[in-house]
Amino acid sequence: MSDKPRRDTGSTGTGSGRSTGQSGSNRAVGAPNPGTGRSPNASTGGNRSAGNQAGNSGRPASAGRNQATTPAPNRNTPPAGARQGGAANARTGTPPVARGGGGGVTPPTGRGGNNPRAARNQPRSRQQPEEREREHVLRRPPPQPAARPVVRPRGPVALPPVMTVRELSEATGIGAADILKAMLKAGMLANINQQIDYETAALIMADFGIETTEDVPEQMAGIVEDVKEVLRAQPPEEMRPRPPVVTIMGHVDHGKTKLLDAIRSTRVAEGEAGGITQHIGAYQIEVNHRKITFLDTPGHEAFTAMRARGAQVTDIVVLVVAADDGVKPQTEEAIAHVKAAGVPMIVAINKIDLPTANPDRIKQQLANVGVIVEEYGGNVPCVHVSARQKINIDGLLEMILLVADLEDLRANPNAPAVGTIIEAKLDKSRGPVATVLIQNGTLHLEDNVLVGCVAGKIKSMFSDSGKRLRHAEPSTPVEIVGLEGVPQAGDILQVMDDLVVAREIALQRQRQQRAEVMAAAARGTSLEELFGKVKQGQVKELNLILKADVQGSLDAIAHLIEQLNQSQQAVQTRIIHRGVGAITEGDVNLALASHAIIIGFNARPDPAARRHAEQHGIDIRFYNIIYQLQDDLKKAMAGMLAPTVKEVVEGYAEVRNTFRLPTREVVAGVYVSDGKITRTGQNVRVLRRGVVIHDGKISSLKRFKDDVREVTAGYECGLIVEGFNDIEVGDALEFYRQETVAASL
């Protein structure tokens, strides 16, 4: 340290090794402000050029010198003025620089300037921790909402006709996962967004003890589901006689279309492809000032479903049988459909003009399949005709009118129209076109209609001959144009006041139809389900459809079922149709309509029948041994009786020692005298002097401190009886298993 006086610093700074060039200035740049001890440059935080300080002030400045930005000092750094002459230098004793003296000063050292070490020693920005905190908050997962408490309703819950599993969960308070588990137990595989119908929802909610009611929308209240109910609801004074609707059925090439052609005196048969009717045609004729409507259902087996629909809208069935060919499989199938529909039948024995015709043989064959004509003491009229020669056609028409008079067919022509779709198609030029049979009321042009899942407005109507119509009365078949979609055959047409309401109902029905199809595919009609309904008293009769490889097998199965019916009276099994050959789509349709089970004895379904059965959930059982069929029928019928619980004793042991564990449980050291001990699946009885003092389960089974699953006779082991600590030496143990055995007839 030198005691020499400090030399003038007017031209050179000492702190940074850089010349300030501010000689003659009134105030040294970098000097501390009075009372603050802080450099002006430190407070501004900007880059200041000394040359900008000159000018009129008379303070020369060094051109282009940049002052380094100096942040505020931290608490460990002394004030800048202490190092720049704001106070006496503690090391040299140099007095502070005078405010008015000329000469420069040493700039701040250690912080600022272009000193790289000073830049490294600067404190971090105060905003960096805040930014890190914000980033942490953004990365933090959002809080999960609190679980909503499950509130189960006290009274019945109103449910719509169709809903999703999620909507059912929200309406009832039952978790969607619990509903899906219950549906899985019931044999229905679903997801949370799958639509289910009300019947399925009510069945599932019954398992949870929740009562439900169906909430039918107001616009659905007046919707027609059954035409017969509409006819019953009509005022008797408004009812008027209507023409009969006649369906022609029979085996392929037995002359059905030619018979209808002879009746209408047209050449319809020549226009058919291959001589086989390809669609359901509806025609109306006039006889003795009275009208008769005919439905020509195809006789080929590939169109069995269309024939079934024809039987549902008909009043009278004319069964055509060729006099030279006899009763065929399609003939028997048509008879089964007629019986299932419950409509009167007229037998028309055709081709009597042929030399090989034998009407008596035909009548005998019909009697063998359950159709007894009037000549044989039955109630089925029989008419001999020849479609080719037009023999006795008038006699057949008179018989149809006679049967119609006996049936007293009536309808109300003044009511809004209600009918059934016979067929529908998409025409390239006209759009959706449907053939409808009016069954009650009168259909007019510009009527708003609802047809199944389709709505629309009647834009045009045509008769069977192609004539434009303005209205159609009961029993009249018409072709209508104006629907917004193609309906399904068998859908009910109903006149609506508002087209908007009709569209809403059509959309609702589309949802319901999808739900029903999915539910039917998941649930189906199985043998176990039918017997479950029998057990609950819902079904008193079991319907069966039998198909076999030979007639002898059919007779043997029929005799077997007759014996089962005689052995018990609780449930009667009825064979609604039987035949020889493969299981057809017609068999599936009949089973679907009559809730029947199909039994194939050495008979398999064709591909179309298999797909149809899978789509609608129809149960088809296959057998090749008649005793297996007998056993299954007996087991299914026995399922109506309460099952019995049978005990099977599997082992005995005696207690030879006891040990008490720190958990206060008692370990019994036993010797297995007979049978075996199993850790799971067995119950144990503790007997003391022959009296049962406890009945429970085994919670632990060990040998030499090792857990074992089973101990056989002749070995010792240790065990703990669950929930029982009073076991004593000398007690006898009996190990048994419970088995549920179905009751037998």
Swiss-Prot record:
Keywords: Cytoplasm, GTP-binding, Initiation factor, Nucleotide-binding, Protein biosynthesis. Residues 127-138 have a biased composition (Basic and acidic residues). Residues 36-56 have a biased composition (Polar residues). Residues 386-388 are annotated as: G5. Residues 250-257 are annotated as: G1. InterPro entries: EF-G-like_DII, EFTu-like_2, IF2_II, IF2_N, P-loop_NTPase, Small_GTP-bd, T_Tr_GTP-bd_dom, TF_IF2_bacterial-like. Residues 241-410 form the tr-type G domain. Residues 68-98, 114-126 have a biased composition (Low complexity). Residues 350-353 are annotated as: G4. It is found in: Cytoplasm. One of its GO terms (biological process) is translational initiation. PROSITE patterns: G_TR_2, IF2. Residues 1-154 are annotated as: Disordered. Residues 296-299 are annotated as: G3. Residues 99-113 have a biased composition (Gly residues). GO terms for cellular component: cytoplasm; cytosol. Belongs to the TRAFAC class translation factor GTPase superfamily. Classic translation factor GTPase family. IF-2 subfamily. One of the essential components for the initiation of protein synthesis. Protects formylmethionyl-tRNA from spontaneous hydrolysis and promotes its binding to the 30S ribosomal subunits. Also involved in the hydrolysis of GTP during the formation of the 70S ribosomal complex. This is Translation initiation factor IF-2. It comes from Chloroflexus aurantiacus (strain ATCC 29366 / DSM 635 / J-10-fl).
